[in-house]
A protein has these predicted regions:
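Extended hydrophobic-aromatic, low-complexity segments
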Residues: 296-300, 338-341, 351-355, 370-371, ...
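Active-site catalytic pocket residues across diverse enzymes, especially alpha/beta-hydrolases
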Residues: 51, 228-232, 333
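Non-catalytic, mostly N-terminal accessory regions of nucleic-acid modification and defense proteins
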Residues: 1-203, 265, 269-278, 372-375, ...
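Conserved Class I SAM-dependent methyltransferase catalytic core
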Residues: 20, 24, 33-46, 199, ...
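Conserved S-adenosyl-L-methionine
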Residues: 185-289, 294-312, 324, 344-347, ...
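Hydrophobic alpha-helical scaffolding
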Residues: 139, 160, 214, 242-246, ...
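Short, surface-exposed amphipathic charged segments that create phosphate/polyanion-binding patches used
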Residues: 285, 383-390, 427-433
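Short, contiguous acidic/charged loop-to-helix segments that flank catalytic cores in large enzymes
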Residues: 28, 298-320, 345-352, 374-380, ...
Length: 529
């Protein structure tokens, strides 16, 4: 009797599923349309999962906790939208619920999903203009192709993939993948995870308001929320405000935040922060940002020359927005205790065109720390960039459980350019958790310890304002951090003697090998007698 064979099913990884989704659409639509379609499906899948989880939670509360077993009463409570909305969960009908949508026949799937998007856009204020309208009919995928993609997305089961942040892994996979394959401008919306984590860890946005004037897909807000959760804080104590000028990325931000249940205020439309500040009269406790590097053509609005945000500092160059971002961020900070962490190209550290503005920032004591990051951390550029920390309160006092000292007139410089050993995707650099902790340790110790001299060669140095003044108001860390001259450690006489010995040894080996080779040819009859 033949032996019965056991069929072995290979367990699919999350990355395999997500790759299959991308692969199914290869060559079938424009890149941005593929991104929007896939992220919309992920969005519908996960709001459906949160809806089911909330439904189970409500039933458990009524039946198990309150002891009410009247099924009619239970069903009535389950059908009340406010039972879901109070926990940041969207109330879904059969028309918008993933588990119902995926039962649609393949030929009607595109219309069903587009209808679900329009229904959510009409009925959920937070999702107004967040989802791409008619994206499924626009891409015109064959019914079988769309069905295969939907089936792949449906495999992403929270019960199977128990990651702490499964939503984040899925969203970041697509954002990262499309950023890697995009050109520079299309890749601007994605800030590497380890950089965002570093910013959040340094400025500690535990409570109050968090603002990003160029929020991209909302990554800064997501990381801030995760930071709060990791430290046992209350995410509902934080209010998120942002703005984004690119319409497609504006939609991504709304989807990214809504899918996680993060309450947000992103303004009424996608528009430039410079020409139309959507939060004009507000000041914020924390600001996290990754503005487009060296942005040009940002100043084409009527009030540029007289913009009140430049008051006391001078008008920034119209040809490069770096210092316009700095002044905007400073203008939006709470005047008593606001703190900001943001990224700029290294050229902003010593740009001659902005010397007077930089001089005023230093003399007004707004710059707390300058941290140069390693190269190759971004998908869209290989340049090294700088993390700036601005602080409106360097006078000291209690802060998140620590007693800070008075740091008036001081700026901490940190140089991380050599921290480039953690490579992924063959060439990109990512800071490790240990490295992020080390930077925080340097920064926090400097904030709290008595300051006499705070320095470590080739890594950090705390400079007084008068030192910065003496160096022409340059903020380049290498102007302050001590770098050891390795040449002075070399004993040249001994080194030359050793090299001479090595050369003599090589010459002896060469002569011996040559003699053996000549002898071998003689034996073969080719040598001279």
């Amino acid at each position: 009797m033949a032996k019965k064979q056991t069929k072995i099913t290979k367990e699919e990884t999350l990355e395999t599923i997500l790759f299959n989704c991308r692969n199914s659409l290869r060559g079938r639509a424009a890149m941005t349309d593929k991104r929007d379609l896939l992220l919309t499906l992920v969005f519908l899948k996960f709001i459906g999962e949160r809806f089911k989880q909330q439904k189970d939670k409500i039933r458990h509360e009524i039946v198990e906790v309150q002891g009410i077993h009247d099924e009619a009463f239970v069903e009535m409570q389950l059908s009340r939208p406010n039972q879901y909305m109070q926990d940041g969960v969207f109330f879904l009908t059969d028309e918008t619920f993933w588990d119902k949508l995926i039962l649609t026949a393949p030929t009607g799937m595109a219309i069903a999903f587009d209808t679900a998007i329009k229904t959510l856009d009409d009925n959920e204020p937070k999702l107004k203009n967040a989802l791409p309208q008619q994206i499924f009919t626009k891409t015109a995928l064959e019914p079988g192709v769309l069905k295969s993609v939907v089936d792949e997305i449906n495999k992403i089961d929270p019960k199977k993939f128990t990651d702490h942040d499964l939503i984040g892994r899925v969203y970041e996979y697509f954002l990262q993948a499309f950023s890697i394959n995009a050109d520079k401008e299309e890749g601007e919306f994605y800030t590497p995870h380890s950089i965002v984590e570093l910013i959040a860890s340094l400025i500690e946005p535990f409570d109050g308001t968090v603002y990003d004037p160029c929020c991209g897909s909302g990554g800064m807000f997501v990381q801030a929320t995760k930071f709060i959760e990791a430290h046992g804080g209350n995410t509902k104590a934080v209010n998120v405000y942002g703005q984004e000028s690119e319409p497609a990325t504006y939609r991504l931000a709304k989807m990214n935040l809504a899918i996680r249940g993060i309450s947000y205020h992103l303004g009424d439309k996608a528009v430039s922060t410079f020409s139309d500040d959507q939060h004009k009269d507000l000041k914020f406790d924390y600001i996290m940002a990754n503005p487009p590097f060296n942005l040009k053509k940002y100043a084409e609005y009527g009030e540029f020359e007289t913009d009140p945000r430049w008051k006391g500092y001078g008008v920034p160059p119209a040809s490069n927005a770096n210092y316009a971002w700095i002044l905007h961020i400073l203008n939006k900070l709470d005047v008593n205790h606001g703190i900001a962490g943001f990224l700029l190209a290294n050229g902003a550290l010593d740009d001659s065109d902005t010397l007077e503005i930089r001089k005023q920032l230093i003399e007004n004591d707004k710059i707390e720390a300058i941290i140069v990051l390693p190269r190759n951390m971004f998908y869209s550029t290989d340049i090294s960039v700088t993390l700036w920390i601005l602080n409106n309160n360097k006078k000291g006092g209690p802060w998140h459980g620590r007693q800070l000292r008075n740091r008036t007139g001081e700026t901490l410089f940190i140089d991380l350019r050599t921290w480039n050993s953690n490579i992924y995707e063959k060439k990109y650099v990512r800071l490790t958790e240990t490295e992020i902790s080390r930077v925080c340790q340097i920064y926090f110790n400097w904030q709290t310890e008595n300051f006499a001299e705070y320095a470590e060669p080739e890594l950090y140095y705390a400079a007084h304002c008068d030192e910065i003044q003496q160096k022409g108001y340059s903020l380049v860390p290498s102007r302050y951090i001590e770098f050891i001259d390795r040449d002075t450690e070399i004993d040249y006489k001994s080194a030359l003697t050793e090299m001479s010995h090595q050369f003599d040894e090589l010459k002896k080996r060469w002569d011996a090998n040559e003699a053996e080779l000549v002898n071998a040819f003689k034996i073969l009859g080719y040598g001279k007698e």
